[in-house]
């Protein structure tokens, strides 16, 4: 496995330490929660949602059935490492992760020295580290990383000046990203205030304006079911737009282009494909 070769390479470096030497690593107990109606209970994020750019709470858990709930929240000076499924992905903790119940499928990485936070984040974001995390002896075959595995991950430690420079840049990137998310939330709030939208309107509309149509009536008359016409949230959005000044996207942009389809041939190349 390629990852195992990276492990050997890192362990050959004289200036390497174990991840467990630099951080406390732990994992909450497995959680089997009971869901509640939207807006009631404790907001919950899955591992996938934690890595989303714009996550939305889709599941709310009944508080009495969340054991040791205080251990399932995260702090902004921590790192989170995916340990199940697609292992080895790392993320910083951002403002929208706070005050949410976070799945046990993410290991909590708590730096022992705050000065090493930036270096740890930068190093663990590299493809080099991800290959290490996915190495066979660390669970690549079973797609799972235990706390004991993560503690043994080799971390290369260059000179203090190098780590400080890279670490400060990484920390600044995290702070600026956090600021950008806050500014985006403010922009959305301003837009909602301007058009008179309410963030809870979608939930209210689905219960208040949702229509019911007989499938037999549709099939009998060979009609086409346009779901937009029967979803209250969509109708609300249409009404909000019609009540405001608006214009077509084509009139507001210089061009709208859709590239043609092309046949892809995969192989060794310097051209990445997304």
Question: Which residues are covered by each model-predicted region?
Answer:
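Short Ser/Thr-interspersed hydrophobic loop/turn segments at strand-loop and sheet-helix junctions
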Residues: 20-30, 44-52, 73-90, 123-134, ...
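A short glycine-rich beta-alpha junction/loop motif
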Residues: 99-107, 138-161
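DNA target-recognition patches
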Residues: 20, 32-66, 238-242, 250-253, ...
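Non-catalytic DNA-recognition/assembly elements of restriction-modification systems
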Residues: 1-31, 159-260
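Short, well-ordered loop/turn elements at secondary-structure boundaries
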Residues: 38-40, 73-77, 103, 149, ...
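Short helix/strand-bridging catalytic loops that position acidic/His residues to coordinate divalent metals
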Residues: 60-68, 105-106, 152
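A short beta-sheet element
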Residues: 69-72, 80-123
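Short, positively charged
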Residues: 117-146
């Amino acid at each position: 496995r390629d990852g195992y070769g990276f492990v050997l390479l890192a362990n050959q470096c004289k200036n390497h330490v174990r991840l467990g030497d630099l951080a406390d690593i732990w994992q909450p107990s497995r959680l089997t929660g009971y869901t509640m109606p939207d807006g009631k209970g404790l907001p919950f994020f899955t591992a996938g949602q934690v890595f989303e750019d714009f996550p939305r709470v889709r599941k709310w858990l009944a508080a009495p059935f969340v054991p040791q709930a205080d251990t399932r929240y995260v702090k902004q000076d921590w790192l989170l490492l995916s340990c199940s499924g697609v292992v080895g992905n790392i993320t910083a903790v951002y403002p929208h992760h706070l005050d949410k119940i976070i799945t046990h499928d993410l290991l909590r990485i708590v730096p022992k020295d705050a000065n090493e936070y930036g270096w740890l984040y930068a190093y663990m974001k590299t493809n080099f580290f991800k290959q290490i995390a996915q190495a066979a002896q660390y669970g690549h075959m079973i797609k799972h990383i235990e706390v004991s595995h993560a503690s043994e991950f080799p971390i290369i430690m260059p000179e203090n000046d190098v780590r400080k420079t890279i670490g400060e840049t990484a920390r600044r990137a995290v702070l600026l990203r956090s600021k950008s998310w806050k500014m985006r939330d403010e922009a959305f709030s301003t837009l909602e205030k301007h058009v008179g939208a309410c963030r809870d309107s979608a939930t209210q509309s689905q219960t208040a304006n949702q229509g019911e149509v007989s499938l037999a009536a549709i099939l009998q008359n060979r009609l086409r079911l346009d779901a937009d016409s029967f979803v209250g949230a969509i109708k609300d959005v249409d009404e909000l737009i019609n009540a405001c000044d608006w214009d077509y996207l084509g009139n507001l942009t210089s061009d709208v282009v859709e590239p043609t389809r092309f046949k892809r041939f995969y192989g060794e190349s310097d051209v990445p494909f997304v």
